[in-house]
Amino acid sequence: MRKFIPLLAALALSACSSLGNQAFSGESATFGSDNILRNDVLKIVRTAEAASFNCRNIESVHSKINSAHKVHGRMQVREVWTVRACGQAHRYNIGLFEDARGETDFTVRLISR
């Protein structure tokens, strides 16, 4: 649970930060002091952009929390990330799930092609 506390604190945080050339805006449970979770999710999004759209240049990410609640005592957060890459916008469903060790597992799914 200790590792998940920064994730919960970030829920209320409206953040704008950058990593390399990517500008992040909006609200996300992945934003935190070290952004490790955000960067892990972004790696999967980058892979999806390269595989689906042959694009390796992510310009910006805008995130929105759709829901955050506990299931069996563990947090689950659902977000939508709108990714601008190579002049196009694509949306991804991001799922964040607290595991038994207090760490966070995640899923990334392209909403539509």
Question: Where in the sequence are the language-model features?
Answer:
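Sec-dependent bacterial lipoprotein signal peptides
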Residues: M1-S17
